[in-house]
Amino acid sequence: MPKRILQGTVVSDKNDKTVVVRVERRFAHPILQKTVRRSKKYKAHDENNQFKVGDLVSIEECAPISKDKRWTVVSAQS
């Protein structure tokens, strides 16, 4: 099965080797037929502590690293 890749914004870098990334998705509301925005936060592994708050990044699914971390940061987006 291919690994999922998501794009999001770093919202916290206070943990060692971990960043919290907010990923936003948009969908049409089934009744109102209006575009709705929902976001979810993922903890991602950042081996070199190189990403800072506000950076746009891509995260990739991986094997569990800890209780909450199942994603790793692949690259920064411009």
From Swiss-Prot:
Keyword terms: Ribonucleoprotein, Ribosomal protein, RNA-binding, rRNA-binding
Listed GO MF terms: rRNA binding; structural constituent of ribosome
Signal peptide residue numbers: none
GO cellular component, one term: cytosolic small ribosomal subunit
Function according to Swiss-Prot or TrEMBL: One of the primary rRNA binding proteins, it binds specifically to the 5'-end of 16S ribosomal RNA.
Gene Ontology biological process terms in this record: translation
Oligomeric and partner information: Part of the 30S ribosomal subunit.
InterPro entries registered for this protein in UniProt: NA-bd_OB-fold (IPR012340), Ribosomal_uS17 (IPR000266), Ribosomal_uS17_bact/chlr (IPR019984)
Similarity annotation: Belongs to the universal ribosomal protein uS17 family.
Listed name of the protein: Small ribosomal subunit protein uS17
CDD domains: Ribosomal_uS17
